[in-house]
Amino acid sequence: MDIKRTVLWVIFFMSAVMLYDNWQRSHGRPSMFFPSATQTAPAAAGGASGAGATTTAGNVPAPAAGTAPATTAPAAQAQLVKFSTDVYDGEIDTRGGTLAKLTLKKQGDGKQPDLYITLFDHTAGHTYLARTGLLGGDFPNHNDVYTQVNAGPTSLSGDQNTLKLSFESPVKGGVKVVKTYTFTRGSYVIGVDTKIDNVGTTPVTPTLYMELVRDNTAVETPMFSHTFLGPAVYTDAKHFQKINFSDLDKNKADYVTSADNGWVAMVQHYFASAWIPQHGVKRDIYAEKIDPSLYRVGVKQPVAAIAPGQSADVQARLFAGPEEERMLEGIAPGLELVKDYGWVTIIAKPLFWLLEKIHSYVGNWGWAIVLLTLLIKAVFFPLSAASYKSMARMKEITPRMQALRERFKNDPQKMNAALMELYKTEKVNPFGGCLPVVIQIPVFISLYWVLLASVEMRGAPWILWIHDLSQRDPYFILPVLMAVSMYVQTSLNPTPPDPVQAKMMKFMPIAFSVMFFFFPAGLVLYYVVNNVLSIAQQYYITRKLGGVKKKPA
Protein backbone atom coordinates (compact mmCIF):
# COMPACT_ATOMS: atom_id res chain seq x y z
CA MET A 1 0.00 0.00 0.00
CA ASP A 2 2.78 2.47 0.94
CA ILE A 3 4.67 1.66 -2.28
CA LYS A 4 1.64 2.46 -4.38
CA ARG A 5 0.89 5.66 -2.49
CA THR A 6 4.50 6.78 -2.77
CA VAL A 7 4.49 6.15 -6.51
CA LEU A 8 1.20 8.05 -6.88
CA TRP A 9 2.51 11.06 -4.99
CA VAL A 10 5.80 11.01 -6.91
CA ILE A 11 3.92 10.86 -10.24
CA PHE A 12 1.58 13.66 -9.18
CA PHE A 13 4.29 15.90 -7.76
CA MET A 14 6.74 15.38 -10.64
CA SER A 15 3.94 15.94 -13.18
CA ALA A 16 3.07 19.21 -11.48
CA VAL A 17 6.72 20.32 -11.33
CA MET A 18 7.47 19.35 -14.94
CA LEU A 19 4.25 20.97 -16.15
CA TYR A 20 5.12 24.19 -14.35
CA ASP A 21 8.71 24.18 -15.65
CA ASN A 22 7.58 23.45 -19.21
CA TRP A 23 5.07 26.27 -19.01
CA GLN A 24 7.81 28.59 -17.69
CA ARG A 25 10.13 27.79 -20.62
CA SER A 26 7.40 27.95 -23.26
CA HIS A 27 6.47 31.42 -22.03
CA GLY A 28 9.98 32.79 -22.17
CA ARG A 29 10.74 32.58 -18.46
CA PRO A 30 13.77 30.95 -16.85
CA SER A 31 13.67 27.21 -16.29
CA MET A 32 13.84 26.01 -12.69
CA PHE A 33 16.46 23.44 -13.71
CA PHE A 34 18.41 25.17 -16.50
CA PRO A 35 18.03 28.92 -15.94
CA SER A 36 20.62 29.86 -18.55
CA ALA A 37 18.64 28.14 -21.28
CA THR A 38 15.98 30.82 -21.24
CA GLN A 39 17.91 33.71 -19.71
CA THR A 40 17.06 37.00 -21.39
CA ALA A 41 20.10 38.18 -23.28
CA PRO A 42 20.78 41.89 -23.54
CA ALA A 43 20.22 43.27 -27.01
CA ALA A 44 20.95 46.58 -28.59
CA ALA A 45 18.02 48.78 -29.34
CA GLY A 46 16.81 48.33 -32.84
CA GLY A 47 18.29 44.86 -33.14
CA ALA A 48 17.18 42.60 -35.94
CA SER A 49 14.55 40.02 -35.33
CA GLY A 50 16.19 36.69 -35.72
CA ALA A 51 16.14 33.32 -37.32
CA GLY A 52 13.32 32.85 -39.69
CA ALA A 53 12.76 36.60 -39.82
CA THR A 54 15.04 37.84 -42.56
CA THR A 55 12.23 39.92 -44.07
CA THR A 56 11.61 41.74 -40.80
CA ALA A 57 11.12 45.40 -40.16
CA GLY A 58 14.60 46.45 -41.25
CA ASN A 59 13.43 49.63 -42.96
CA VAL A 60 10.41 50.31 -40.73
CA PRO A 61 11.05 53.50 -38.71
CA ALA A 62 11.99 52.45 -35.19
CA PRO A 63 12.25 55.41 -32.83
CA ALA A 64 10.16 55.09 -29.72
CA ALA A 65 6.52 55.98 -30.20
CA GLY A 66 5.88 59.66 -29.79
CA THR A 67 9.41 60.67 -30.83
CA ALA A 68 9.54 62.69 -34.04
CA PRO A 69 12.51 62.39 -36.43
CA ALA A 70 14.75 65.38 -36.89
CA THR A 71 13.61 67.74 -39.66
CA THR A 72 14.71 71.09 -40.98
CA ALA A 73 11.21 72.53 -40.52
CA PRO A 74 9.70 73.16 -37.08
CA ALA A 75 8.03 70.02 -35.76
CA ALA A 76 4.23 70.05 -35.79
CA GLN A 77 2.53 69.76 -32.43
CA ALA A 78 0.88 66.37 -31.88
CA GLN A 79 -2.43 66.07 -30.06
CA LEU A 80 -4.46 63.33 -28.45
CA VAL A 81 -7.97 62.94 -29.87
CA LYS A 82 -10.24 61.27 -27.34
CA PHE A 83 -13.11 59.05 -28.47
CA SER A 84 -15.75 56.84 -26.88
CA THR A 85 -17.98 53.96 -27.97
CA ASP A 86 -20.10 51.48 -26.06
CA VAL A 87 -17.07 49.17 -25.65
CA TYR A 88 -14.08 51.54 -25.81
CA ASP A 89 -12.71 54.73 -24.33
CA GLY A 90 -9.57 55.69 -26.19
CA GLU A 91 -7.13 58.20 -27.58
CA ILE A 92 -5.66 58.55 -31.06
CA ASP A 93 -2.30 60.31 -31.18
CA THR A 94 -2.13 62.61 -34.21
CA ARG A 95 1.55 61.73 -34.44
CA GLY A 96 1.17 58.91 -36.91
CA GLY A 97 -2.58 58.68 -36.34
CA THR A 98 -1.59 56.03 -33.80
CA LEU A 99 -4.10 54.23 -31.59
CA ALA A 100 -2.29 55.10 -28.38
CA LYS A 101 -4.83 54.35 -25.65
CA LEU A 102 -7.72 51.91 -25.50
CA THR A 103 -9.76 51.07 -22.41
CA LEU A 104 -12.25 48.21 -22.57
CA LYS A 105 -15.39 49.54 -20.89
CA LYS A 106 -17.44 46.35 -20.99
CA GLN A 107 -14.94 44.53 -18.80
CA GLY A 108 -16.33 46.37 -15.77
CA ASP A 109 -19.86 46.67 -14.43
CA GLY A 110 -19.46 50.04 -12.76
CA LYS A 111 -19.29 48.45 -9.31
CA GLN A 112 -15.74 47.18 -9.75
CA PRO A 113 -13.76 49.95 -11.50
CA ASP A 114 -10.54 47.94 -11.26
CA LEU A 115 -12.02 45.60 -13.88
CA TYR A 116 -11.82 48.33 -16.51
CA ILE A 117 -8.77 47.15 -18.41
CA THR A 118 -6.63 49.62 -20.37
CA LEU A 119 -5.19 47.55 -23.20
CA PHE A 120 -3.31 50.13 -25.30
CA ASP A 121 -1.43 52.81 -23.40
CA HIS A 122 1.65 54.99 -23.76
CA THR A 123 2.98 56.25 -20.45
CA ALA A 124 6.34 56.48 -18.73
CA GLY A 125 5.83 53.03 -17.23
CA HIS A 126 4.00 51.13 -19.95
CA THR A 127 3.84 51.11 -23.76
CA TYR A 128 1.38 49.17 -25.88
CA LEU A 129 -0.03 50.62 -29.11
CA ALA A 130 -1.07 49.97 -32.71
CA ARG A 131 0.42 52.01 -35.54
CA THR A 132 0.86 52.09 -39.32
CA GLY A 133 2.90 53.92 -41.95
CA LEU A 134 4.44 53.72 -45.42
CA LEU A 135 7.79 52.40 -46.60
CA GLY A 136 9.53 52.50 -50.00
CA GLY A 137 10.40 56.20 -50.02
CA ASP A 138 10.21 59.36 -47.97
CA PHE A 139 6.52 58.71 -47.34
CA PRO A 140 4.32 59.44 -44.30
CA ASN A 141 4.96 57.11 -41.35
CA HIS A 142 4.11 56.87 -37.66
CA ASN A 143 6.47 59.74 -36.78
CA ASP A 144 4.63 62.35 -38.85
CA VAL A 145 1.91 64.52 -37.35
CA TYR A 146 -1.51 64.01 -38.93
CA THR A 147 -4.50 66.34 -38.74
CA GLN A 148 -8.05 65.26 -38.02
CA VAL A 149 -10.32 65.41 -41.06
CA ASN A 150 -13.82 66.88 -40.72
CA ALA A 151 -13.57 67.04 -36.94
CA GLY A 152 -16.97 66.19 -35.53
CA PRO A 153 -18.44 64.06 -32.75
CA THR A 154 -15.96 61.61 -31.29
CA SER A 155 -18.49 59.60 -29.32
CA LEU A 156 -20.92 56.94 -30.47
CA SER A 157 -24.36 58.38 -29.78
CA GLY A 158 -27.44 56.37 -28.90
CA ASP A 159 -28.79 56.08 -32.44
CA GLN A 160 -25.45 55.50 -34.19
CA ASN A 161 -24.15 52.09 -35.20
CA THR A 162 -20.69 53.24 -36.32
CA LEU A 163 -18.21 55.97 -35.50
CA LYS A 164 -15.63 57.07 -38.10
CA LEU A 165 -12.53 59.10 -37.28
CA SER A 166 -10.22 60.19 -40.12
CA PHE A 167 -6.72 61.64 -40.03
CA GLU A 168 -4.70 63.14 -42.89
CA SER A 169 -0.92 63.11 -43.16
CA PRO A 170 1.30 65.87 -44.49
CA VAL A 171 2.46 65.39 -48.08
CA LYS A 172 5.78 63.57 -48.21
CA GLY A 173 7.46 62.12 -51.30
CA GLY A 174 4.48 63.20 -53.36
CA VAL A 175 2.16 61.06 -51.21
CA LYS A 176 -0.66 61.94 -48.84
CA VAL A 177 -2.31 59.39 -46.54
CA VAL A 178 -5.81 59.49 -45.08
CA LYS A 179 -6.29 56.97 -42.30
CA THR A 180 -9.85 56.18 -41.17
CA TYR A 181 -10.81 54.21 -38.06
CA THR A 182 -14.30 52.69 -38.04
CA PHE A 183 -15.71 51.64 -34.67
CA THR A 184 -18.87 49.50 -34.68
CA ARG A 185 -21.34 49.26 -31.82
CA GLY A 186 -20.80 46.17 -29.68
CA SER A 187 -17.70 45.09 -31.62
CA TYR A 188 -14.06 44.72 -30.61
CA VAL A 189 -13.02 44.78 -34.28
CA ILE A 190 -11.89 48.16 -35.60
CA GLY A 191 -11.86 48.84 -39.33
CA VAL A 192 -8.67 50.61 -40.45
CA ASP A 193 -8.79 52.06 -43.97
CA THR A 194 -5.62 53.58 -45.42
CA LYS A 195 -6.13 55.75 -48.51
CA ILE A 196 -2.88 56.57 -50.31
CA ASP A 197 -3.06 59.55 -52.70
CA ASN A 198 -0.30 60.22 -55.22
CA VAL A 199 -0.28 64.02 -55.43
CA GLY A 200 3.13 64.07 -57.08
CA THR A 201 4.26 63.87 -60.70
CA THR A 202 5.74 60.35 -60.79
CA PRO A 203 4.35 56.88 -60.02
CA VAL A 204 4.97 55.53 -56.51
CA THR A 205 5.04 51.97 -55.18
CA PRO A 206 4.77 52.22 -51.38
CA THR A 207 4.55 49.42 -48.84
CA LEU A 208 2.13 49.71 -45.94
CA TYR A 209 3.24 48.44 -42.53
CA MET A 210 0.84 47.65 -39.69
CA GLU A 211 2.35 46.78 -36.33
CA LEU A 212 1.72 46.28 -32.64
CA VAL A 213 4.31 47.67 -30.25
CA ARG A 214 4.56 46.85 -26.55
CA ASP A 215 6.90 46.29 -23.64
CA ASN A 216 7.33 42.98 -21.83
CA THR A 217 5.46 43.97 -18.67
CA ALA A 218 2.92 41.34 -17.61
CA VAL A 219 -0.62 42.47 -16.81
CA GLU A 220 -3.16 40.71 -14.54
CA THR A 221 -1.25 37.44 -14.16
CA PRO A 222 -2.21 35.49 -11.01
CA MET A 223 0.58 34.58 -8.60
CA PHE A 224 2.14 31.15 -9.38
CA SER A 225 0.17 31.07 -12.67
CA HIS A 226 2.24 32.33 -15.57
CA THR A 227 0.46 32.64 -18.90
CA PHE A 228 1.94 33.51 -22.28
CA LEU A 229 2.89 37.12 -22.97
CA GLY A 230 4.26 38.12 -26.35
CA PRO A 231 3.78 38.20 -30.13
CA ALA A 232 2.03 35.47 -32.09
CA VAL A 233 1.64 34.71 -35.79
CA TYR A 234 -1.05 32.67 -37.52
CA THR A 235 -0.89 31.40 -41.12
CA ASP A 236 -2.57 28.54 -42.95
CA ALA A 237 0.85 26.92 -43.42
CA LYS A 238 2.06 26.80 -39.81
CA HIS A 239 -1.07 27.74 -37.88
CA PHE A 240 -0.47 29.31 -34.45
CA GLN A 241 3.12 30.25 -33.63
CA LYS A 242 4.02 31.94 -30.35
CA ILE A 243 7.14 34.11 -30.28
CA ASN A 244 8.85 34.49 -26.93
CA PHE A 245 10.37 37.83 -26.04
CA SER A 246 13.49 35.95 -24.95
CA ASP A 247 13.86 34.53 -28.49
CA LEU A 248 13.65 38.03 -29.93
CA ASP A 249 16.30 39.12 -27.42
CA LYS A 250 18.63 36.42 -28.74
CA ASN A 251 17.67 36.73 -32.44
CA LYS A 252 16.39 33.15 -32.41
CA ALA A 253 12.70 33.66 -33.15
CA ASP A 254 11.34 31.16 -35.67
CA TYR A 255 8.09 31.91 -37.49
CA VAL A 256 6.58 32.20 -40.97
CA THR A 257 7.86 35.39 -42.64
CA SER A 258 5.67 35.53 -45.74
CA ALA A 259 2.03 34.62 -46.43
CA ASP A 260 -1.15 35.79 -48.13
CA ASN A 261 -3.37 34.90 -45.16
CA GLY A 262 -3.53 34.94 -41.38
CA TRP A 263 -2.77 37.60 -38.81
CA VAL A 264 -0.23 38.87 -36.27
CA ALA A 265 -1.03 39.49 -32.61
CA MET A 266 0.15 40.51 -29.18
CA VAL A 267 -1.14 38.12 -26.52
CA GLN A 268 -1.45 38.53 -22.77
CA HIS A 269 -3.53 36.97 -20.00
CA TYR A 270 -7.24 37.36 -20.85
CA PHE A 271 -6.74 39.93 -23.65
CA ALA A 272 -5.16 40.25 -27.09
CA SER A 273 -4.79 42.53 -30.09
CA ALA A 274 -4.31 41.47 -33.71
CA TRP A 275 -3.80 43.02 -37.13
CA ILE A 276 -5.90 41.11 -39.66
CA PRO A 277 -5.06 42.10 -43.27
CA GLN A 278 -7.33 41.13 -46.15
CA HIS A 279 -7.18 37.45 -47.09
CA GLY A 280 -5.31 36.60 -50.28
CA VAL A 281 -3.07 39.68 -50.19
CA LYS A 282 0.67 39.03 -50.05
CA ARG A 283 2.41 40.33 -46.94
CA ASP A 284 5.73 39.92 -45.12
CA ILE A 285 5.72 39.26 -41.38
CA TYR A 286 8.23 40.62 -38.91
CA ALA A 287 8.89 40.60 -35.18
CA GLU A 288 11.79 42.25 -33.39
CA LYS A 289 13.15 44.03 -30.39
CA ILE A 290 13.41 47.79 -30.97
CA ASP A 291 14.39 49.05 -27.52
CA PRO A 292 15.79 47.54 -24.30
CA SER A 293 12.25 46.58 -23.25
CA LEU A 294 10.18 47.32 -26.36
CA TYR A 295 9.10 44.83 -29.02
CA ARG A 296 6.96 44.83 -32.15
CA VAL A 297 5.22 42.43 -34.47
CA GLY A 298 3.70 43.45 -37.77
CA VAL A 299 3.10 42.95 -41.46
CA LYS A 300 4.45 44.77 -44.53
CA GLN A 301 1.98 44.78 -47.40
CA PRO A 302 3.20 45.98 -50.83
CA VAL A 303 0.85 48.32 -52.68
CA ALA A 304 0.57 48.25 -56.48
CA ALA A 305 2.07 51.21 -58.37
CA ILE A 306 -0.01 54.37 -58.02
CA ALA A 307 0.05 56.77 -60.97
CA PRO A 308 0.09 60.56 -60.42
CA GLY A 309 -3.36 61.81 -59.50
CA GLN A 310 -4.53 58.31 -58.55
CA SER A 311 -5.05 56.66 -55.18
CA ALA A 312 -5.08 53.22 -53.58
CA ASP A 313 -7.14 51.92 -50.67
CA VAL A 314 -5.82 49.31 -48.24
CA GLN A 315 -8.33 47.88 -45.81
CA ALA A 316 -7.51 45.90 -42.68
CA ARG A 317 -9.07 45.03 -39.36
CA LEU A 318 -7.66 45.53 -35.89
CA PHE A 319 -8.96 43.34 -33.07
CA ALA A 320 -8.42 44.59 -29.54
CA GLY A 321 -10.40 42.95 -26.78
CA PRO A 322 -11.02 40.00 -24.47
CA GLU A 323 -10.15 36.43 -25.44
CA GLU A 324 -13.74 35.23 -25.60
CA GLU A 325 -13.47 32.00 -27.54
CA ARG A 326 -16.80 32.04 -29.40
CA MET A 327 -16.39 35.67 -30.43
CA LEU A 328 -12.84 35.09 -31.68
CA GLU A 329 -13.93 32.13 -33.82
CA GLY A 330 -16.24 34.44 -35.78
CA ILE A 331 -13.63 37.12 -36.46
CA ALA A 332 -10.81 35.29 -38.26
CA PRO A 333 -9.62 31.69 -38.75
CA GLY A 334 -7.53 30.55 -35.79
CA LEU A 335 -7.95 33.75 -33.80
CA GLU A 336 -9.46 31.77 -30.91
CA LEU A 337 -5.99 30.26 -30.39
CA VAL A 338 -4.81 33.46 -28.69
CA LYS A 339 -6.68 31.98 -25.74
CA ASP A 340 -3.73 29.75 -25.00
CA TYR A 341 -4.23 26.33 -23.40
CA GLY A 342 -0.76 25.13 -24.40
CA TRP A 343 -0.25 21.43 -25.07
CA VAL A 344 -3.60 20.45 -23.50
CA THR A 345 -5.66 22.38 -26.09
CA ILE A 346 -7.13 19.20 -27.60
CA ILE A 347 -8.77 18.36 -24.25
CA ALA A 348 -9.26 21.89 -22.93
CA LYS A 349 -11.39 23.18 -25.81
CA PRO A 350 -14.14 20.52 -25.40
CA LEU A 351 -14.07 21.09 -21.63
CA PHE A 352 -14.61 24.82 -22.08
CA TRP A 353 -17.42 24.13 -24.55
CA LEU A 354 -19.10 21.95 -21.92
CA LEU A 355 -18.50 24.52 -19.17
CA GLU A 356 -20.03 27.19 -21.41
CA LYS A 357 -23.09 25.03 -22.09
CA ILE A 358 -23.64 24.44 -18.38
CA HIS A 359 -23.28 28.17 -17.72
CA SER A 360 -25.94 28.92 -20.36
CA TYR A 361 -28.41 26.99 -18.17
CA VAL A 362 -27.37 27.97 -14.65
CA GLY A 363 -26.23 31.54 -15.37
CA ASN A 364 -23.41 31.45 -12.80
CA TRP A 365 -19.81 30.47 -13.59
CA GLY A 366 -19.20 29.27 -10.02
CA TRP A 367 -22.08 26.80 -10.14
CA ALA A 368 -21.03 25.85 -13.69
CA ILE A 369 -17.61 24.86 -12.29
CA VAL A 370 -19.27 22.80 -9.54
CA LEU A 371 -21.55 20.99 -12.00
CA LEU A 372 -18.77 20.37 -14.54
CA THR A 373 -16.56 18.87 -11.82
CA LEU A 374 -19.48 16.68 -10.72
CA LEU A 375 -20.02 15.55 -14.32
CA ILE A 376 -16.33 14.72 -14.83
CA LYS A 377 -16.24 12.72 -11.59
CA ALA A 378 -19.32 10.80 -12.73
CA VAL A 379 -17.70 9.98 -16.09
CA PHE A 380 -14.55 8.75 -14.38
CA PHE A 381 -16.42 6.91 -11.62
CA PRO A 382 -15.64 3.42 -13.05
CA LEU A 383 -11.92 4.25 -13.10
CA SER A 384 -12.08 5.74 -9.62
CA ALA A 385 -13.96 2.68 -8.39
CA ALA A 386 -11.25 0.40 -9.78
CA SER A 387 -8.61 2.48 -8.03
CA TYR A 388 -10.44 2.50 -4.68
CA LYS A 389 -11.13 -1.24 -4.90
CA SER A 390 -7.43 -1.86 -5.45
CA MET A 391 -6.66 0.37 -2.48
CA ALA A 392 -9.18 -1.54 -0.35
CA ARG A 393 -7.58 -4.88 -1.27
CA MET A 394 -4.18 -3.48 -0.40
CA LYS A 395 -5.57 -2.25 2.91
CA GLU A 396 -6.78 -5.76 3.73
CA ILE A 397 -3.35 -7.28 3.36
CA THR A 398 -1.47 -4.38 4.95
CA PRO A 399 -1.08 -6.19 8.35
CA ARG A 400 0.47 -9.18 6.57
CA MET A 401 2.75 -6.86 4.58
CA GLN A 402 3.90 -5.20 7.79
CA ALA A 403 4.55 -8.58 9.34
CA LEU A 404 6.73 -9.59 6.37
CA ARG A 405 8.65 -6.32 6.55
CA GLU A 406 9.28 -6.85 10.25
CA ARG A 407 10.28 -10.48 9.69
CA PHE A 408 12.75 -9.74 6.86
CA LYS A 409 13.80 -6.23 7.85
CA ASN A 410 17.46 -7.23 7.74
CA ASP A 411 17.20 -8.93 4.34
CA PRO A 412 15.67 -6.61 1.69
CA GLN A 413 15.90 -9.25 -1.04
CA LYS A 414 13.90 -11.83 0.89
CA MET A 415 11.44 -9.16 2.00
CA ASN A 416 10.74 -8.10 -1.61
CA ALA A 417 10.43 -11.72 -2.72
CA ALA A 418 7.98 -12.45 0.11
CA LEU A 419 5.91 -9.38 -0.74
CA MET A 420 5.77 -10.36 -4.41
CA GLU A 421 4.63 -13.84 -3.42
CA LEU A 422 1.93 -12.33 -1.20
CA TYR A 423 0.70 -10.12 -4.06
CA LYS A 424 0.61 -13.14 -6.36
CA THR A 425 -1.23 -15.33 -3.87
CA GLU A 426 -3.85 -12.68 -3.06
CA LYS A 427 -4.08 -11.58 -6.72
CA VAL A 428 -3.31 -7.99 -5.80
CA ASN A 429 -1.45 -5.57 -8.04
CA PRO A 430 0.37 -2.97 -5.89
CA PHE A 431 0.14 -0.55 -8.80
CA GLY A 432 -3.45 -1.40 -9.70
CA GLY A 433 -4.73 1.87 -8.30
CA CYS A 434 -2.21 3.98 -10.20
CA LEU A 435 -3.39 3.61 -13.80
CA PRO A 436 -6.95 4.90 -13.23
CA VAL A 437 -5.53 7.98 -11.51
CA VAL A 438 -2.85 8.60 -14.18
CA ILE A 439 -5.46 8.44 -16.97
CA GLN A 440 -7.44 11.24 -15.29
CA ILE A 441 -4.48 13.59 -14.82
CA PRO A 442 -4.57 15.18 -18.35
CA VAL A 443 -8.27 15.97 -17.91
CA PHE A 444 -7.79 17.67 -14.55
CA ILE A 445 -4.75 19.59 -15.85
CA SER A 446 -6.82 20.70 -18.86
CA LEU A 447 -9.63 21.92 -16.63
CA TYR A 448 -7.04 23.83 -14.61
CA TRP A 449 -5.93 25.73 -17.74
CA VAL A 450 -9.52 26.26 -18.87
CA LEU A 451 -10.29 28.05 -15.61
CA LEU A 452 -7.00 29.96 -15.63
CA ALA A 453 -7.24 31.17 -19.25
CA SER A 454 -10.95 32.01 -19.50
CA VAL A 455 -11.65 35.73 -19.35
CA GLU A 456 -15.25 34.81 -18.57
CA MET A 457 -14.09 34.16 -14.98
CA ARG A 458 -12.89 37.77 -14.67
CA GLY A 459 -15.34 39.63 -12.48
CA ALA A 460 -17.70 36.64 -12.31
CA PRO A 461 -19.24 36.18 -8.83
CA TRP A 462 -20.20 32.90 -7.21
CA ILE A 463 -21.88 33.21 -3.80
CA LEU A 464 -21.58 35.35 -0.68
CA TRP A 465 -17.94 36.43 -0.31
CA ILE A 466 -16.71 35.31 -3.77
CA HIS A 467 -17.24 38.32 -6.04
CA ASP A 468 -14.59 37.50 -8.65
CA LEU A 469 -13.61 33.94 -9.58
CA SER A 470 -10.41 35.17 -11.27
CA GLN A 471 -9.09 36.65 -8.00
CA ARG A 472 -7.93 34.86 -4.86
CA ASP A 473 -10.43 34.19 -2.09
CA PRO A 474 -10.33 37.42 -0.02
CA TYR A 475 -10.91 35.54 3.25
CA PHE A 476 -9.03 32.32 2.31
CA ILE A 477 -12.09 30.22 3.13
CA LEU A 478 -11.80 28.02 0.04
CA PRO A 479 -8.07 27.27 0.54
CA VAL A 480 -8.77 26.26 4.15
CA LEU A 481 -11.63 24.01 3.01
CA MET A 482 -9.29 22.51 0.45
CA ALA A 483 -6.66 21.78 3.11
CA VAL A 484 -9.31 20.14 5.31
CA SER A 485 -10.63 18.05 2.42
CA MET A 486 -7.11 16.92 1.53
CA TYR A 487 -6.47 15.95 5.14
CA VAL A 488 -9.73 13.97 5.31
CA GLN A 489 -8.93 12.27 2.02
CA THR A 490 -5.48 11.31 3.30
CA SER A 491 -6.87 10.01 6.60
CA LEU A 492 -9.22 7.64 4.77
CA ASN A 493 -6.19 5.72 3.56
CA PRO A 494 -4.03 3.49 5.76
CA THR A 495 -1.02 5.13 7.35
CA PRO A 496 2.20 4.09 5.57
CA PRO A 497 4.47 1.95 7.76
CA ASP A 498 7.43 4.14 6.85
CA PRO A 499 7.51 7.10 9.32
CA VAL A 500 9.03 9.40 6.66
CA GLN A 501 6.20 8.63 4.24
CA ALA A 502 3.64 9.10 6.99
CA LYS A 503 5.03 12.56 7.81
CA MET A 504 5.09 13.47 4.12
CA MET A 505 1.42 12.50 3.75
CA LYS A 506 0.49 14.74 6.69
CA PHE A 507 2.57 17.61 5.33
CA MET A 508 1.14 17.56 1.78
CA PRO A 509 -2.27 19.14 2.62
CA ILE A 510 -0.53 22.03 4.39
CA ALA A 511 1.94 22.59 1.54
CA PHE A 512 -0.76 22.57 -1.12
CA SER A 513 -3.12 24.81 0.84
CA VAL A 514 -0.40 27.46 1.29
CA MET A 515 0.19 27.50 -2.47
CA PHE A 516 -3.54 27.66 -3.18
CA PHE A 517 -3.97 30.69 -0.92
CA PHE A 518 -2.83 32.76 -3.91
CA PHE A 519 -4.68 30.90 -6.68
CA PRO A 520 -7.82 32.32 -8.35
CA ALA A 521 -10.97 31.40 -6.42
CA GLY A 522 -12.40 29.56 -9.44
CA LEU A 523 -9.46 27.16 -9.47
CA VAL A 524 -9.61 26.53 -5.73
CA LEU A 525 -13.37 25.97 -5.96
CA TYR A 526 -12.76 23.28 -8.57
CA TYR A 527 -10.21 21.50 -6.35
CA VAL A 528 -12.42 21.72 -3.25
CA VAL A 529 -15.39 20.21 -5.10
CA ASN A 530 -13.17 17.56 -6.66
CA ASN A 531 -11.76 16.57 -3.26
CA VAL A 532 -15.19 16.41 -1.60
CA LEU A 533 -16.53 14.22 -4.41
CA SER A 534 -13.45 11.99 -4.21
CA ILE A 535 -14.00 11.55 -0.46
CA ALA A 536 -17.66 10.66 -1.04
CA GLN A 537 -16.75 8.18 -3.79
CA GLN A 538 -14.05 6.53 -1.72
CA TYR A 539 -16.31 6.26 1.33
CA TYR A 540 -19.15 4.80 -0.74
CA ILE A 541 -17.01 2.24 -2.54
CA THR A 542 -15.10 1.19 0.59
CA ARG A 543 -18.33 0.77 2.57
CA LYS A 544 -19.93 -1.16 -0.28
CA LEU A 545 -16.96 -3.52 -0.43
CA GLY A 546 -17.15 -3.97 3.33
CA GLY A 547 -20.85 -4.88 3.08
CA VAL A 548 -20.14 -7.43 0.37
CA LYS A 549 -17.45 -9.04 2.51
CA LYS A 550 -19.82 -9.44 5.50
CA LYS A 551 -22.75 -11.03 3.64
CA PRO A 552 -21.32 -14.57 3.18
CA ALA A 553 -20.58 -14.75 6.89
UniProtKB/Swiss-Prot annotation:
Key words, A-Z: Cell inner membrane, Cell membrane, Chaperone, Membrane, Protein transport, Transmembrane, Transmembrane helix, Transport
Pfam families, per database record: 60KD_IMP, YidC_periplas
Gene Ontology MF annotations: membrane insertase activity
UniProt-annotated location(s): Cell inner membrane
GO biological process entries: protein insertion into membrane; protein transport
Membrane topology: Multi-pass membrane protein
Top-level lineage group: Bacteria
Transmembrane annotation, as ranges: 7-24, 365-385, 435-455, 474-494, 509-529
Entry GO CC: plasma membrane
Record note on quaternary structure: Interacts with the Sec translocase complex via SecD. Specifically interacts with transmembrane segments of nascent integral membrane proteins during membrane integration.
Family the UniProt entry places it in: Belongs to the OXA1/ALB3/YidC family. Type 1 subfamily.
Cited function: Required for the insertion and/or proper folding and/or complex formation of integral membrane proteins into the membrane. Involved in integration of membrane proteins that insert both dependently and independently of the Sec translocase complex, as well as at least some lipoproteins. Aids folding of multispanning membrane proteins.
HAMAP family tied to this protein: YidC_type1 (MF_01810)
Name of the protein in question: Membrane protein insertase YidC
